[in-house]
Amino acid sequence: MKNKIYLIVSILFLSVTAISAQTDEEKQKLSIFSEYVKAKNYNAAYAPWMELRLASPRINKAIYVYGERILNDTIANSEGEEKIKYILDLLKLWEERRTVFPNITPQGAYLAKASQLKYDNQKLLGESKEDLYTAFDAAYITDAKTFTNPKSLYTYFSLMVGLYDSSLKSAQELFSKYDDISEKIDFEVKNYTNKRNAFLGEDGEVLELSRKDTSRLKSYNSYLRAYNQIAGSIDTKLGSR
């Protein structure tokens, strides 16, 4: 009986030791690739990042935040089949993020990012205009609230115009989508204007802000400039149709 108890205790001790050692190793890999990413040494970051991504996908959101930066850099410095491989892996990474961290991965935002990535590489990936529009449309229908990227909203409407010009969409569908996107832009302009104004005084002067709030204000102003630009671009794109 004593021997059995000793054996059980020994097994438990070895298991805990192994888990602890594994956790320490994972933390070390996380620290290593994180520091490489911060230094923008993406080539060095790739191997430890990929090892940890495959072994422990739930350990930390940095796998997905920094992983996106790593793959974007790899895509930018690749060509042909190799570039396609990394593009597809980035799309896969976003899917994994939605599975592992759904609460911090808004569907509309990430489906739009995936659609934009496909659009930006449509020739390389062999994507048709119809398939691209369907992808953007699915993102918008699924979660319009977080589909806020100005560039993607413009791309979405631009694809609709292209399909209309190819007689694949009706005039009613075109103008309905124009109204839809225009209303979305108006809503987001009001949204970001309110966010920006929270950092301004009564006379419009910028209040004394923390570094974090200064960064937020810069982001809000950037969004407002982008929305103003695409609002005009959408009108131009529609033209006399």
Question: Model features per residue range: what roles?
Answer:
Residues 1-26, 68:
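Bacterial Sec-dependent N-terminal signal peptides
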Residues 22-241:
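Preference for long, solvent-exposed alpha-helical segments and helix-linker "stalks"
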